């Protein structure tokens, strides 16, 4: 629309690259995609010749390589013999993840560079390389508006970890390309990058940072953020043969329609406080407070039709695979649609494996997989018992049909469900020590607490009904300064009544939903800012502000009903 109306390139009227990754633009700049050369050049014959000459590389690639989904298909077909994976977890994050795992399992050589030792992908690695994490890296980052910024390390390198550029250089030198990879520091690479951007450019290519081709090390260290490319298109000129823009018609691929066997449409995405496959954010108990378990969100009308209630276990199935989730009934979806989060993996859960579910269909131009419209069906599961375990130390074995673990303050919370005698589960999961327990065979309940010098070190609560105490108070007892009594521990609550804060909404300030709703109601608050002034909620990172706004709206509706 901005192009057709002649406003393209003016402030507020520019294309926005919805890439999802903070340095995706930087990846394009340096040719980090299989479909591009370095310095924002494509595989046109003249560009291949230019880069070949600049790098003195006679064996230059002359056409685009394999995109991610295609790559793993070729590995599975035996067409790719070696794979080096850096800073990603494709065994979880790609669609039809079961096929990806099959490909990794049969690939003759897999190397993985990561700052996390144990990931679903690293389990297929023949060689593991300890890489620098984000806070240990030194270099530049480019955001979506082409702003290049210096990123300086916050922490020294841990152990044998090394930056990716150093690891690549060492491998290349060992293979014989000593001169081509003789980098001593990130500034060396940046200078080469700048030289290539201006090499035989003459104004033909928008990306040109040649003014930094000879930047000194001190100047690089002190580099201030700058945006390259000026304001393209604002002058009405475009990088085409006649200088005019092109409107390219795009044929919309057909959306997946619900079928008789697959009557629902599965949408997938991320939770508010987690990122990718939780290899980093999953280490934080605070970030796990918002959602401690993988949930399938379902519209109330669909839930009623399928006789699914909140907290039920539900198997989500698609033509690609199936996985088990906890049900969350929500009117935030349209009828016929369900949503599951992408984060959970084999490392955290026996269920919640969203990567197994989407179809591996991709956009024909970008190769981007579609994760938003997979035909699916839901099946309610009825285990004999459901419950949870809390423990200071992660149990060595979790022999439950359904189990998902999450870090909490001073320990772990493991949600469990299954069939058979739960006493066998207690024996396998709980540590040795002074034990107190209550068994109610009529209700199918088992409550066990393990103490050490009177202090709680582990507990298990399971029930046929699935109704168990709130987790938060029991979790707090793992590090309580004053030990709770045996009666309180087995009851799962303190003897003296405590205010129920409800689910945590603001992680930064530990503010619960019920606290926010009560404050909105009693003080007549009508804005997120007012809630922030009263409770501090929403005044730090800001990710909970939409949730607070919804609570304000819901409270106002209830008041005027």
Name every feature range the model reports, one short phrase each:
Residues 1-137, 171, 175, 227, ...:
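Catalytic alpha/large subunits of respiratory electron-transfer oxidoreductases
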Residues 157-160, 164-215, 277, 281-297, ...:
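Long, contiguous, secondary-structure-rich segments that constitute the structural scaffold
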């Amino acid at each position: 629309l901005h192009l057709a109306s002649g406003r393209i390139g003016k402030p507020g009227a520019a294309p926005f690259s919805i890439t999802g990754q903070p340095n995706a633009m930087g990846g394009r700049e340096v040719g980090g995609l299989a479909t591009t050369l370095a310095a924002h050049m494509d595989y046109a014959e003249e560009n291949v010749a230019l880069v070949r000459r600049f790098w003195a590389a006679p064996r230059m690639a002359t056409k685009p390589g394999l995109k991610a989904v295609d790559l793993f298909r070729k590995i599975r077909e035996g067409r790719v013999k070696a794979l080096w994976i850096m800073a990603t977890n494709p065994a979880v994050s790609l669609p039809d993840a079961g096929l990806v795992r099959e490909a990794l399992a049969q690939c003759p050589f897999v190397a993985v560079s990561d700052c996390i030792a144990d990931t679903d992908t690293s389990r297929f690695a023949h060689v593991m390389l300890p890489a620098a994490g984000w806070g240990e890296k030194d270099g530049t980052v480019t955001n979506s508006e082409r702003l290049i910024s210096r990123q300086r390390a916050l922490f020294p390198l841990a152990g044998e970890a090394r930056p990716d550029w150093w690891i690549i250089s060492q491998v290349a030198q060992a293979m014989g390309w000593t001169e081509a990879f003789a980098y001593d520091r990130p500034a060396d690479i940046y200078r080469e990058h700048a030289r290539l951007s201006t090499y035989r450019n003459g104004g033909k290519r928008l990306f040109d940072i040649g003014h930094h081709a000879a930047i000194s090390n001190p100047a690089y260290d002190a580099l201030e953020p700058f945006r390259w490319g000026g304001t393209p298109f604002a002058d009405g000129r475009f990088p085409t043969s006649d200088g005019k823009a092109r409107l390219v018609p795009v044929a919309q691929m057909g959306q997946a329609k619900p079928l008789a066997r697959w009557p629902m449409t599965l949408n997938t995405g991320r939770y508010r406080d987690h990122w990718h496959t939780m290899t980093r954010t999953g280490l934080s108990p605070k970030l796990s407070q918002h959602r401690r378990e993988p949930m399938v969100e379902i519209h109330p009308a669909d839930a009623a039709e399928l006789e699914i209630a909140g907290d039920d276990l539900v198997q989500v199935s698609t033509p690609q695979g199936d996985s088990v989730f906890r049900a969350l009934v929500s009117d935030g979806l349209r009828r016929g649609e369900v949503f599951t989060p992408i984060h959970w993996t084999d490392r955290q859960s026996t269920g919640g494996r969203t990567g197994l579910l989407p179809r591996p269909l991709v956009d024909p131009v970008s190769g981007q997989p579609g994760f938003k419209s997979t035909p699916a069906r839901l099946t309610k599961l009825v285990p004999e018992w459901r419950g949870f375990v809390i423990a200071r130390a992660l149990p060595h074995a979790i022999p439950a049909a359904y189990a998902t673990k999450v870090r909490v303050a001073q320990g772990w919370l493991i949600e469990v469900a299954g069939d058979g005698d739960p006493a066998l589960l207690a024996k396998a999961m709980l540590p040795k020590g002074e034990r107190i327990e209550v068994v109610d065979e009529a209700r199918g309940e088992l409550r066990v607490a393990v103490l050490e010098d009177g202090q709680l070190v582990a507990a298990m609560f399971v029930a046929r009904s699935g109704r168990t105490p709130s987790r938060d108070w029991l979790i707090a007892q793992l590090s309580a300064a004053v030990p709770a009594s045996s009666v309180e521990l087995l009851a799962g609550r303190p003897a003296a009544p405590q205010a129920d804060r409800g689910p945590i909404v603001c992680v930064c300030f530990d503010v619960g939903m019920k606290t926010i709703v009560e404050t909105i109601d009693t003080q007549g608050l009508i804005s997120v800012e007012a809630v922030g002034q009263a409770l501090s909620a929403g005044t730090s990172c800001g990710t909970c502000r939409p949730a607070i706004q919804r609570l304000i709206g819901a409270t106002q509706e209830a008041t005027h009903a």
